[in-house]
Amino acid sequence: MSDATLSLKQRLGGRSLYLVGMMGSGKTSTGRPLAEQLGYGFVDADAVIEQAAGCSIPEIFERDGEAGFRALESQVLNAIGQRHSLVVATGGGVVTQQENWGLLHSGIVVWLDVVPEQLMQRLRADSTVRPLLQTEDPDAALNALLNQRRPLYAEADLTVVINQETPLAVADGILQLLPSLLKDPTQRRTD
């Protein structure tokens, strides 16, 4: 760990980083190297939800509907929030539940804002079943979700705009933005 990263870790004081953004934005693939560089633990909230439910997210949606999934997601987020020094890859819709924001803001919220065209390409190439895109027009569904969630994601402490950067490059960008946020937490940062 470099001296700068060690200093950053000390200044974070154990506060967790919560990565938010649309499905396919790279929260998990960015979160792993970010956690490793900071010497933090890494948690994929969706994986914890699946473990808690004993089934996949599409199965949870099918069995309990979106409302049931969101309730479980909030419970899992509260459990994760009891720990410190984590990088947490959240689910794409975590920001839609007002009760989640108190916990998210106990740490530092980082929005991975993927350029819409790039996001569509990523999701088309990904074999993961996305319950909210199981419609006749997935592109229209994605655009509707983006329009609904953008103002919510914009409440993040840091925004990192992503086009074709690798997850490691995105993690490095977050590490470069964090010191200025810690100096002046009233200023949201965008890269």
Curated annotation (Swiss-Prot):
GO biological process annotation, one example: chorismate biosynthetic process
Major site of localization recorded for this protein: cytoplasm
Top-level division of the source organism's lineage: Bacteria
Group of enzyme by EC: transferase
Pfam families (alphabetical): SKI
Residues where ATP binds: 24-29, 130
Annotated PROSITE patterns: SHIKIMATE_KINASE (PS01128)
Binding site for substrate: 46, 70, 92, 149
SUPFAM superfamilies with a match to the protein in the record: P-loop containing nucleoside triphosphate hydrolases (SSF52540)
Record-listed E.C. numbers: 2.7.1.71
Keyword Cell inner membrane: no
Sorted UniProt keywords: Amino-acid biosynthesis, Aromatic amino acid biosynthesis, ATP-binding, Cytoplasm, Kinase, Magnesium, Metal-binding, Nucleotide-binding, Transferase
Compartments reported by the entry: Cytoplasm
Record's catalysed reaction(s): shikimate + ATP = 3-phosphoshikimate + ADP + H(+)
Subunit relationships: Monomer.
Task performed by this protein: Catalyzes the specific phosphorylation of the 3-hydroxyl group of shikimic acid using ATP as a cosubstrate.
Protein name, as recorded: Shikimate kinase
